[in-house]
Amino acid sequence: MIKSADRNSVVAFYPEFASQTRLFTALSQPTFTKAPKKLFRELIFPAKVFIGVCMKTKAVRLYGVNDLRLEEFELPPIKDDEILAKVVSDSVCMSSHKLAMQGDAHKRVRAKLSENPVIIGHEFCGTLVEVGKKWQHQFKAGQKFAIQPALNKDGTLWAPGYSYAHIGGDATYIIIPAEVMELGCLLEYKADNFFMGSLSEPVSCVVGAFHAQYHTTAGSYEHRMGIVEGGSLALLAGVGPMGLTAIDYAIHNPRKPGFLVVTDIDDARLQRAESLLPPSEAAKHGVKLVYVNTRDIKDPAAKLKELNGGKLYDDVFVFAPVKPVVELGDSLCGKDGCLNFFAGPTDPSFSAMYNFYNVHYESHHVVGTSGGNTDDIKESLHMMAKGELNPVTMITHVGGLDQVADTVINLDKIPGGKKLIYTHKKLPLTALADFEAKGKTDPFFAELAKIVQKSDMLWSKEAEDYLLKHAPDL
């Protein structure tokens, strides 16, 4: 018979606490016999049980331009309006690369990094460990969570992964500050895996971009939000990880185009996109889908116009901050055409030619979004749960927390899509396509190769479960 929720009892169920808790004083006195882990967690883990838990964390922090350091340090005990959480997975975003390149100059940095380093990573998923008193009616320890990092607090750009000392995705444990909950940006995640939770944020960026599109009616000042239903849509440089998600969303969301053209200049990337999201799948949903390599086309604008029956496009998305691509997008917009500049540049002076004659006489307009909002991430989670979106196609590499610094700094030079990090693991960044070759000398990768081959070389719950169980701990 256990008469109190003492430290040793908790450690028996959660070994990670053995070396990481500094103060673990039980206040409540539940009396219970041996119970299943789930019941034990429910009895022990409410924050009222503890007078503060001081947790050690390992995290990658940014100190300045390309100055990323994997460090171990102690998190303070949480306050009544905070939540202690365990991060399991984080997917590396190009925005983190841009943050590392810009350092203090980045718009989301709120204080001098050399004196106030921030934990990087904002596409993360994990479990709640200790819930402050203020939030115990809404959240419980043991719940899985996803997060909407674009807080928009008081009109600022502050966000986890950019602006905070104790919260970011590339860490083992974090403290979720009050504003995340106050703004409705901590979301319960009910799936049986973690990697899809990490993908919900990048998916929400695409969802938000589609919702940000708008069109007008002559003689009216009302903006009709969204792409033109049944219209024509061009995704330029659109077969990277975010482009793949945009194709998936364009085909499967309720407001679809009638014609969708996707361009790139890399045959291998185009072939992978077409194999994952084939024109036959789009046709089932009433969308004509065409993939085009524009690399060797002398006049890509004319070719893309020809593919659209000689007409220009209602909606154009630009997925690369490249001047000729932006200008191609401008030239493709038809009457009342909306150009979405999706890819954020690192150069504050980045610019391109834009036809203002057409702004005046053809009602052209341009939009840009930086992340989705909370409704967008909820829509993403909902569509993913129903199987309407399958963003796992974005994942091409997996690795451990020890790989984050090099991966973020060199992200623009590493081919493929999303790099998925498991934060409690020490594991070289490895492409799924390379598992079989590495498996010739490493049984761990040999087994992973067999698992991903069963799912058409895509990451899966089975692969994640195997990695979490067998990959070396950090």
Enumerate the predicted regions with their spans.
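Rossmann-fold NAD(P)-binding glycine/threonine-rich loop
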Residues: 343-362
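Adenosine-nucleotide cofactor-binding segment
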Residues: 230-231, 236, 247, 251-325, ...
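Short, Lys/Arg-enriched N-terminal segments with co-localized hydrophobic residues
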Residues: 37-54
